[in-house]
Amino acid sequence: MVRSGKKAVVLATVAFCATSVVQKTCGFVPSPLRQRAAAAGAAASVATMFAPAAFADEIGDAAKTLGDASYAFAKEVDWNNGIFLQAPGKLQPLAALKAIDKMIVMGAAADPQLLKAAAEAHHKAITTVSGANGVTSRADWDNVNAALGRVISAVPEKMVMDVYNSVAKITDPKVPAYMNSLVNGADAEKAYAGFLAFKDVVKKNQVTSAAGPATVPSGDTIGVAAQKLSDASYPFLKQIDWLSDVYLKPLPGVSAQQSLKAIDRMIVMGAQADGNALKAAAEAHHKAIGSIDAKGVTSAADYAEVNAAIGRVVASVPKSTVMDVYKAMASVTDTGIPLNMFSKVNPLDANAAAKAFYTFKDVVLAAQR
């Protein structure tokens, strides 16, 4: 059971991370080992509009069969457990970043419409979360699994296995056995067998090559403003301890369900964003990870590219959607958190960065649809 449990944990993580953009969550998603979340997607019925009927039906039908085998297990998992915020073993920030980078590469290669479908499926599933364990409905469980299966089938197998292998490297071998001890072992085995059958259907429909890179604007107002922001804020950036475990700490006084509602706003925003802009942002992050130093700080040039890419993503989303995210995060962020983070850097550099950010925000707002 330990061996198969490890595979189940890691493979389920691969599936979930296909639509994630590094966000911490304690609510429902179809994998017992979650770290962060955020994503892009739509209900399975919407996904079928962007794929051949046979393809959609085959993966959709397989997802229902997986649901038959796994929903009992899903109901036993305590999705509200704070353990999902923890590293799956020893804290290894730089090693974990390599695993996250593989997820980003995989996400960047995925079909934007299928990513959108997966995000919308997650959003819908969050609305039916109930019970003490915070599990979604059976129908939404199936829809999410189908949407994730379609996303994974749209990227080459090697990219999927790169994620699998990188996550396996940072997962303590004792984790699967411990997670298995929290549920009914027979149900876990049945879910794993169902997952393997589902995996075979996804693999049967998998593409052999990835799509080309995103189109990146040159000389646009957001790009120019991003360079100014980066010049003003890079000294501040270099002072941040990117290797700290503070980013894994739970928000004080915030329940799993409260956090999930805030994360849901991010998922909705991701689903509304322009697909090419999201792809470009993922590619910019991948490039930036490639230039980080021993302290986890990227180069000034890559920092500017990331800021520009994020600005373009935000500009592609309605202002009201962006503000929904802002307000949702403000509602779960204790006032002591900004003060604590502020105390760890030079206040003058932090203020200079904030001032530049507000200017950048205005440029993005002017370009917003």
Curated annotation (Swiss-Prot):
Keywords: Chlorophyll, Chloroplast, Chromophore, Light-harvesting polypeptide, Plastid, Repeat, Transit peptide. Sequence repeats lie at residues 57-219, 220-369. The keyword Nucleotide-binding does not apply. Its main location: plastid. It comes from the Eukaryota. SUPFAM superfamilies: Peridinin-chlorophyll protein. Signal peptide: none annotated. GO terms for cellular component: chloroplast; light-harvesting complex. GO terms for molecular function: chlorophyll binding. The record marks 122, 285 as: Chlorophyll a binding. Residues 1-56 form a transit peptide. Pfam families: PCP. It is found in: Plastid, Chloroplast. Homotrimer. Water-soluble antenna for capture of solar energy in the blue-green range. Peridinin is an asymmetric carotenoid. The mature protein is composed of 2 almost identical repeat units. This is Peridinin-chlorophyll a-binding protein 2, chloroplastic. The lineage of its organism: Eukaryota, Sar, Alveolata, Dinophyceae, Amphidiniales.
